[in-house]
Amino acid sequence: MSNGIVAKRYAVALFKIAKEKHVLEMFEEELRLVQNVYEKNGELHSFLTQPNISKEQKKTFLANVFGSVSESILNTLYILIDNKRIDILSDIANEYVVLANEERNVADATVYSTRLLSEEEKLNIAEAFAKRTGKDAIRVKNVVDEDLLGGIKVRIGNRIYDGSLQGKLARIQRELMKNR
């Protein structure tokens, strides 16, 4: 079975537990924290994937590092260690966020711009795209892209809204070529 399918199953199980306990936000925050630490700490990743280190040592280590997370999240980490699937941790976290966002009618947007946007600009973008997409809210993550000439690009899920100067020039060029 592919890692994506397995990750989705774990995410669905966590989502059901979170929904039952009314802790969608908390689980999301904890999963993002665990994912962040796991992805950014090469030593942790290396330790957890070492075959010569016992499962019990790995679990004890996880309990020490992530002792502040909920029992359900910690137990999931233990199961991943037992099943030698800790490598799909990031996929599980990402799948969980998708499920939680769908439940709350929220979307995550990545906004590419030539400079960092102010909080007010992010709020305006979030409001505009919430209306456009029919979502209750949009969570904006700003990424500076120095390759843009001007304007912004917004990515929500697998959809890109291109309001960049490059995009506008490309559309004008296509129109001119079409009208020849």
From Swiss-Prot:
<comment type="similarity">
    <text>Belongs to the ATPase delta chain family.</text>
</comment>
<keyword id="KW-0066">ATP synthesis</keyword>
<keyword id="KW-0139">CF(1)</keyword>
<dbReference type="InterPro" id="IPR020781">
    <property type="entry name" value="ATPase_OSCP/d_CS"/>
</dbReference>
<protein>
    <recommendedName>
        <fullName>ATP synthase subunit delta</fullName>
    </recommendedName>
</protein>
<dbReference type="GO" id="GO:0046933">
    <property type="term" value="F:proton-transporting ATP synthase activity, rotational mechanism"/>
</dbReference>
<dbReference type="InterPro" id="IPR000711">
    <property type="entry name" value="ATPase_OSCP/dsu"/>
</dbReference>
<keyword id="KW-0375">Hydrogen ion transport</keyword>
<comment type="function">
    <text>This protein is part of the stalk that links CF(0) to CF(1). It either transmits conformational changes from CF(0) to CF(1) or is implicated in proton conduction.</text>
</comment>
<keyword id="KW-1003">Cell membrane</keyword>
<dbReference type="GO" id="GO:0005886">
    <property type="term" value="C:plasma membrane"/>
</dbReference>
<keyword id="KW-0813">Transport</keyword>
<comment type="function">
    <text>F(1)F(0) ATP synthase produces ATP from ADP in the presence of a proton or sodium gradient. F-type ATPases consist of two structural domains, F(1) containing the extramembraneous catalytic core and F(0) containing the membrane proton channel, linked together by a central stalk and a peripheral stalk. During catalysis, ATP synthesis in the catalytic domain of F(1) is coupled via a rotary mechanism of the central stalk subunits to proton translocation.</text>
</comment>
<dbReference type="InterPro" id="IPR026015">
    <property type="entry name" value="ATP_synth_OSCP/delta_N_sf"/>
</dbReference>
<comment type="subunit">
    <text>F-type ATPases have 2 components, F(1) - the catalytic core - and F(0) - the membrane proton channel. F(1) has five subunits: alpha(3), beta(3), gamma(1), delta(1), epsilon(1). F(0) has three main subunits: a(1), b(2) and c(10-14). The alpha and beta chains form an alternating ring which encloses part of the gamma chain. F(1) is attached to F(0) by a central stalk formed by the gamma and epsilon chains, while a peripheral stalk is formed by the delta and b chains.</text>
</comment>
<keyword id="KW-0472">Membrane</keyword>
<dbReference type="GO" id="GO:0045259">
    <property type="term" value="C:proton-transporting ATP synthase complex"/>
</dbReference>
<dbReference type="Pfam" id="PF00213">
    <property type="entry name" value="OSCP"/>
</dbReference>
<keyword id="KW-0406">Ion transport</keyword>
